[in-house]
Amino acid sequence: MAAPSELQLYPSVIHPAIQKYWDEFCELPAETLSAFSSYYPDILRAFAVSDFLALNILREPELVLSFLQSSQHQKECQLVDFRAPLAEELSGALKEDDLLRILRLFRRRMMFRIIWRDLVCLVDYQVTTREVSWLAETCIDEALSWIYRDMSQQFGEPHSTAGVKQQLVVLAMGKLGANELNVSSDIDLIFTFPERGETQGGNRSLDNQAFFTRLGQRLIQALDNTTADGFVFRVDMRLRPYGQSGALALSFAAMEAYYQEQGRDWERYAMIKARAVAGDIDAGEELLTSLKPFVYRKYIDFGAVQALRAMKEMIEREVQRKGQDGNIKVGRGGIREIEFIVQVFQLMRGGRDVRLQQRNLLSTLECLEDEGLLPVAAAAELREAYIFLRNLEHAIQGLEDKQTQEIPKDEEGRERVAVAMGFPGWGACRVQLDKYRDCVSEHFADIIAERREAPLERPDTIEWKALWAGRLAQDEAQDLLLRSGCDQAQEIYEAVTQLRQSSRVQHMQLQGKERLDEFMPNLLQSLAQSRASHETCRRLLALVEAVLRRSAYLALLNENPGALTELIRLFAESAWIARQIVTTPLLLDELLHSGSLYTPPDTTALRDELRQQMLRIPNDDLEEQMEALRYFKKAHVLRVAASDLRETLPLMKVSDYLTFIAETIIEQVVDEAWETMVKKYGEPGYEDAALNDMRFAVIGYGKLGGIEMSYGSDLDLVFLHGASGDLSTSGETSIANQVFFTRLGQRIIHLLTTKTASGDIYEVDMRLRPSGNSGLLVSSVSAFQQYQEKSAWTWEHQALVRSRAVAGCPGIRAEFEKVRKDILTQHRDPAKLRTEVMDMREKMHASLGTKPDSSGSPPYFDLKHDRGGIVDIEFMVQYAALRWANEYPQIVVWSDNIRILEALGDAGVFSQEDADKLCDIYRLLRAHGHRLALQNLPARIQTDELLEERRWVVAFWEKVFAE
């Protein structure tokens, strides 16, 4: 059967897609086709605008026909229209498989109805978002009720210590909280409960925390897990206190304490839309009322502008990094900018004007207009733009029922989106989109965006343009370079000429070539004026070559002359930094923000920044998570290196920050790995059923453990767990605890070490675990303790001196620290200890020390391994710690060499003068090592350098190990 004549109403580029679905549709029985005949125009439109609708029509034609004949597509639903039918269907669910199947089929039916009405009937977007929100709310609440009843049969019902019955409260954040959920969106939830206590009336009792955690886990699985019937909603729990490392469910008291003591500005922003959607709704709303002082300040909070500005800046960096200019949510002039405009007024003035304490954006926008906080015209323009962008968002997502805000890259996809929006084609739609985005961007700049200085007018660059274009003779070009302050004119001229004549430059596309022709004169002039060497020029030209096919970076430098100045300075001072930026040009973005470039954030800010970045990545997008972690590390290590070069950070702070970066990443990786494993296998079984936290910890050894990391340090790690190996996990696919923790450890290593296009994050060395490479990847704390007491070699106890817990469960970390203290403070035979430490040092020196050259003398001094170097000092520290910690346990409180040396001086083991001298030399040697690392050079110096210090260390070694 030929397609109806209405096919000609659609752009020709999408005819093949419509025809394909139409041909399959025509294979339905004649009786079915006849029943559909009066709906052919709508069916054709559905095929044109949505693969999701088309596939459901072909999969379940009878259901779709019933939907159309009952006129459900012509009327709005109320909340009861979702709740009543789902509650009835679930009343017959006898087991969890029934629950999962019913939820998914119900979601599919209702989502078909909603998307049909949105894209075929073109209903108001607010109707669509309200109905999607009601669907989600219904699925959450009904699933929670079913699982609660099921668990109560086994454990009884939770009660407070005063005997009051308790229920879980599910808080919806973001779009769901505001009843503004998209047609294909995940749901951001937080689980909480009123009071601590325990269950009553079941076969065995659980404390409330454990009960509600298990309840929450099962609820997530019921909604999020993908089965043969699909999923219900993707669930994101990362907005809860402490993020992925936090407890899945917290009491009201713990929630209030967290937000009062540790709440961040971006969490205030997130809490604006929070709403209780399931469980004890009344109690949930009482909790949110108690949290309002955290969100809305009594004074006019001008600091909110800067906080949102920082959030927007972070998002802009990600948009640039990921090339998301076509993203209508986070891109320029997108939905997020409108949200920020509205929410900055809410955060600033909501404490003084309760009318602004609303969840719905358009309602709040109306209040801002009424209160005179936004001009009438601006409010109208923002409202119109917001509605357009939200409708466009639905059109994009409705194509395949996928959570995306990216304009389709292919022509067919764009045309289908335009049709869904009611336009004759993408051209007309794009004109309207650009108009709205320009308008939003203008208003955002007026209200929130930080004013940036216009690029400085450069002096006349005619000569430099002529040099780059090859219009100057060689002697003229070299004379220009010399006159401008460059004393290696010939080498630079030859390098520039070679680049200009290269095939890669000759075959550049027009836009890229124009950007290069604008950039190169500026670069050459800046190089000459900074008296840059040929080596600096070579490094910068390597960068230019690296970005020839990604000329947006050249545009960035053209528009930001200050960034070019910083670039030349850093490339001149550090070969290592130059190499980092050449291999990862995305780091150029860091140069735009000189304030943060030379002031690395503290540990709290580091964790906060990484958490915000990871929150914007879907839970199941492992590739993007890994890329984000790699960029985070590189960007922050670059900041440390820049500060190191400028000497705004002393040596110890450099190592501190490099260590903080590693710890922050490890914490995030552990949380990501744990969440993935628990989702797949359930939580490990514990002999104490009340335990429900991670019970896993990462121990750092070596440079990480000693808080002494350098730019190229790897991670020496040991993994410990606190669960019985005889028990198994709680998931449907259950595995033994030991298998679970082994796979968890493997996944952590995989996330840290897998090489992507951006490289790895860190190299990981696990050889310091009990029994080394032949031992278990993850040991229990008790097995670790037994090994250290009965089997460990002296060198392993030396390594333990520089160890500390860096991530994971606080309880397991505390257990490790106790084991460490007990082992290090044991009494040891001094003579045996002395012999074993000296023997190990001799072996290391024989293996790693510098060998004499043909003249019989060493050609250089290895800062780390040669006599009088870093390892000698570390061995003396470890020997003294093991020798004297039994008598002076304060010696091993810390794991870093400097503080151990200070403790040895305070205890009188070393004289104060000797301890101070060793600290000074240790810092000096490490500072030389850092400087060499920043030049991509090995840790070696000339044999006549630092002679006095090296000889002093050798002499002190003899004194320490004298019999």
Swiss-Prot record:
Disulphide linkage map = none
Which terms does the record give in the GO molecular function aspect? [glutamate-ammonia-ligase] adenylyltransferase activity; [glutamine synthetase]-adenylyl-L-tyrosine phosphorylase activity; ATP binding; magnesium ion binding
Enzyme class, first EC level, given as a word:
transferase
Annotated region (Adenylyl transferase) at 461-963
Q: What is its EC number?
A: 2.7.7.89, 2.7.7.42
Query: What is the reaction catalyzed?
Result: [glutamine synthetase]-O(4)-(5'-adenylyl)-L-tyrosine + phosphate = [glutamine synthetase]-L-tyrosine + ADP; [glutamine synthetase]-L-tyrosine + ATP = [glutamine synthetase]-O(4)-(5'-adenylyl)-L-tyrosine + diphosphate
- Give the start-end ranges of region Adenylyl removase: 1-451
Q: What are the required cofactors?
A: Mg(2+)
Alphabetized, the UniProt keywords read: ATP-binding, Magnesium, Multifunctional enzyme, Nucleotide-binding, Nucleotidyltransferase, Transferase
Q: What is this protein called?
A: Bifunctional glutamine synthetase adenylyltransferase/adenylyl-removing enzyme
Q: Which organism is it from?
A: Hahella chejuensis (strain KCTC 2396)
Corresponding gene? Answer: glnE
